[in-house]
UniProtKB/Swiss-Prot annotation:
Cellular location(s): Cytoplasmic vesicle, Secretory vesicle, Acrosome
Entries under InterPro entries matching the protein: SPACDR (IPR031534)
Positions of region (Disordered): 167-200
Species of origin: Rattus norvegicus (Rat)
Protein name: Sperm acrosome developmental regulator
Amino acid sequence: MRFLRWIRQIWRKVPNWVLFWKHLAKPGLSDQREKHLLKGPEKTSKDFDTVKLANAQKEDMVSDLDVCPGVLRSVKERSPLHDRESRSSRDSRSLMTVVNSVSTFMFSVLQSGWRLCRWKSSMSTGKVSSHTRTGSALGTPEAEMLREVYLVLWVIRKQLRELARRQERRRRRRMRSHASHTSRHSESVQGLKHDARSPL
């Protein structure tokens, strides 16, 4: 039947979907590779005096902090850690939407398959009582296949939920480490300002 062929096709595609979402859930390895590749030509192009550049940048940073204290906030907002956090939160949101879509798909498959099983059992048995019709509908091979499909979808939903929870835990860990890093950075900036204002 067309319904059974459709269920078999979906069943074959299910592992590919799980692998695809697992690949999306992993942190961006391609960004790290691109950064690693970009570091090479940058190193070869830097032939000027690095000591003078570092001193000039330090003086500019201290003067900018004295003039405009909002620069540190804008730099923090554009930091790569902030970008990674936003990317991981987007990934966790997409995983949760996939979990919801799989749940609704499970419900629709169960409902339509149950209707099909009841219709087939009523067509084969004819006029019988509702209790006997329910028992015969549960014993059909279509009902058995529907149970197997439902179990596979339930396992997929469970795996996707675990992936979403891992992503959320990873995102919270990164936020904590980012907060500690920014606090340490602000302390070092305060020390630089104090050194710049001291007469010694």
